[in-house]
């Protein structure tokens, strides 16, 4: 079971400020999670071969082949604003 000192330590590391109710909930949730790990630790695994990956490495992507595209004039005509053949869009990343 997780005790109050461990909750204090975890909240300090995570820089969390929790109400008493949130602390109780966190303590209960973490205790329950650790209980699940204890259950997993008791599963008999003798004779079970370890896996490097849970799934086989198979490329499920299609071949990269050129296909039909729209002429640039059609796409540019649909864009609200263009400049030098490129579509202008609002800035999404600050450079500062």
Curated annotation (Swiss-Prot):
Transmembrane segments: none annotated. InterPro entries: Asp/Glu-ADT_sf_sub_c (IPR036113), GatC (IPR003837). GO terms for biological process: glutaminyl-tRNAGln biosynthesis via transamidation; regulation of translational fidelity; translation. Pfam families: GatC. Gene3D superfamilies: Glu-tRNAGln amidotransferase C subunit, N-terminal domain (1.10.20.60). One of its GO terms (molecular function) is ATP binding. Its EC number is 6.3.5.-. It catalyses: L-glutamyl-tRNA(Gln) + L-glutamine + ATP + H2O = L-glutaminyl-tRNA(Gln) + L-glutamate + ADP + phosphate + H(+); L-aspartyl-tRNA(Asn) + L-glutamine + ATP + H2O = L-asparaginyl-tRNA(Asn) + L-glutamate + ADP + phosphate + 2 H(+). Keywords: ATP-binding, Ligase, Nucleotide-binding, Protein biosynthesis. The keyword Signal does not apply. Heterotrimer of A, B and C subunits. HAMAP family: GatC (MF_00122). Allows the formation of correctly charged Asn-tRNA(Asn) or Gln-tRNA(Gln) through the transamidation of misacylated Asp-tRNA(Asn) or Glu-tRNA(Gln) in organisms which lack either or both of asparaginyl-tRNA or glutaminyl-tRNA synthetases. The reaction takes place in the presence of glutamine and ATP through an activated phospho-Asp-tRNA(Asn) or phospho-Glu-tRNA(Gln). Belongs to the GatC family. This is Glutamyl-tRNA(Gln) amidotransferase subunit C. The gene is gatC.
């Amino acid at each position: 079971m997780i005790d109050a000192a461990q909750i204090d330590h975890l909240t300090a590391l995570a820089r969390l400020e929790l109400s008493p109710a949130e602390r109780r909930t966190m303590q209960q949730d973490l205790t329950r999670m650790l209980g699940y790990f204890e259950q997993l630790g008791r599963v008999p695994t003798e004779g079970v071969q370890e896996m490097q990956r849970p799934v086989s490495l198979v490329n499920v992507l299609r071949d990269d082949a050129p296909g039909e595209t729209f002429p640039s004039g059609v796409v540019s005509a649909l864009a609200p604003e263009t400049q030098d053949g490129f579509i202008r869009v609002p800035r999404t990343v600050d450079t500062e």
